[in-house]
Amino acid sequence: MTRRDFIESSVFLAGAASSVLTPAGAAEDSSQWWLKPVRLFHPNMRESELRGFDTGRFVASCAATNADGIVVSAGGIVAFYPSQVPYHYVSPLLNGRDLLKEVIAALHTAGMRAIARVDFSKARADLFRDHPDWFVRSADGSPRMAGKYYDVCPNSPYLGEGFAFPVIREILKGYDVDGFHLNAGGFPGHCCCSKCQEKYQARFGAKLPSRIDWKDGASTQLVSWRYQSSAECFTRLHEEIGAVRKDVFWTGELAGLDNPTWSRDKALDIVGLSHSFSSLMSTVDNASPDPDLRWVAGMTASYVRSVGERPPIINLKVSMRSAGWAHASMPPAEYAQCAWQAIAHGGGLKMPTFGLPGNIEDERNMAVITETLGALKKHAWVYDDARPIAPVALVWSQRTLDFYGRDDAKARYADCAYGFYAALMENHIPTVVVSDEALLPGKLADFRAVVLPNMACVSDAQARAITEYVRAGGAMIATHETSLYDPSGNRRAGLALEQVMGAAYDPASPTTSAKNAYLCRRQPHAVTAWMRGTSVLPFSGRITPVRLTGDSVAPLVYGSAGNLVDPEEMENPVRTDVPLLIANTFSSGKSIYVACDLDRFYFRSRLDDARRVLGSAVVWALGDSPPLVTNAPSEVGVSLSRKAPFTFLHLVNTVGGRPLSEVVTIRDLEFHLRIGTKVKTVSALRRGSTLPFEARDGQVTFTVPILGAYEVVVIETPSER
């Protein structure tokens, strides 16, 4: 939020309590090194690179990246060691070498960990010939193939004693690996193989549906069953590892929030898998030139950290493979910006390349890998054991994405979450992204406000928890069809959160969508105090038909466009009684209900008026002044973390178009941060300089003279006793 917004908001702040997400499990055990942000480099080795492979050169190139762990190709589709497991293809290019043993020994000598990459998603024709029932089948019985390989079903013995377990045992007993990285886990698509049919029949006493059909109520059951099947597979693999050797790191590639349907397609629910891995790892592969997803790396890191309750691993794809250019790098400034966001929100990094350093055609991002991993290494004292703090929680609901979003999940739900998160970042409101599992009384109490961007699917228990939270002094900001559907995606007769929203669903209203319409100011309110010089704001999108209840008020209502044909006949927008922004106040709590998809509209249009409405709504709901006021451009992202006696303000500069081609240096950024205690020192970490400051009444004021791509302001407070 800018200084101007703060002055115009007409709300004055007292202190600012912050939430603290405490990692599950203590980090004192040095054997569990993954409880701190990790620095992983992953040179995806191609089989052809075995020719003339130089172990010394390989390890030196890995050490140059500042990584503390290297993901090395081990087995699955190709064995990079002399495996004795049946059907485990050993590359003839090894020529008798035990490459895995050589590399592990050399990495350990150089002070780096060795993480064995295994891929149990596909197999060769010989295994398909001998065990055809282990493979994914389409509804017509045909096998699913990826190139010359056959896709394997995670419900089959292949992921157990048939193949995966013997490979894991062989590697653990013969090699001093520090962990495993599972590539391409989950389902490659809907599977109708005999194993899936038998398992589904045994569980539900019904035939396995041939596809996900949202018109069929069984699809909710089918989607949940697929998630559970994947989780069971990963848990079995983890247990097998633990049975051979304790404290072995185990992770697998999961979806980032930039690819919202990947989780459902492959049946990889991050919340459901939170206990299946040592660390949760999510891929951010947003290589397409979409300017609206500039915040998605940080959003993903924040979400996965809160779900896993420990530092996540953000797998940043260096190339533009998702856009069709596997051998071309993302622009270095763009790639770095994604890495800084992940770091700023408490994540570790895994930086992959498609090929070994020195052999790939486009190595421009190797310098970025070295710089960002180097920052994590040099300033480990800042990142290790630091915990995110924020007054606001934004909820990402996988259930809403699945059962409300259905076949149009991005447009119906994800775009709303993207838009509101962007508005929070661009109003400089520190925010943590949580799952809908956090909508419980004990967890909600950690936050001063909870944001529900079109969270349509809300259970009765969640509705009760949110209602009690608001009545006890918390704040809720919700949009569009939040709570209009039950957890299975069935529409209710009314809003489950009607009591706190101050609105009742009115399906008789004829207004459900609007194009080139307006949010019109109807009465003065703090949320609209910034609207000087205008009483109308542009809007196009979907409207939830509601009517006011109780003492709620509607500062903004729907205005129709009127005649748009000729200037001579053009009329002012026609105000209606249809409420679009509803404010409700209780004895201590507050709520804002935006009865339209203004968040989606902001994501798609990037019109600044929508950002300011959403930001002002959150500030008003918080009940006092913003936790942070700055003159920084809206494209500077802020996040906060705490490690006593230090508070860290992370600044990520995203100024510029997308893909980002260069870093635009910004000067003289003034910050007013409510910290609630005395301050000893303020310094800029990366520049290595102290900053003059003024501390008064629990607020510290300072100026950052210059901001490049990323900076951390370190605020030292008196030691806690």
Where are these regions (language model features)?
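Aromatic- and glycine-enriched glycan-recognition loops and surfaces
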Residues: 47-65, 87-110, 162, 229-233, ...
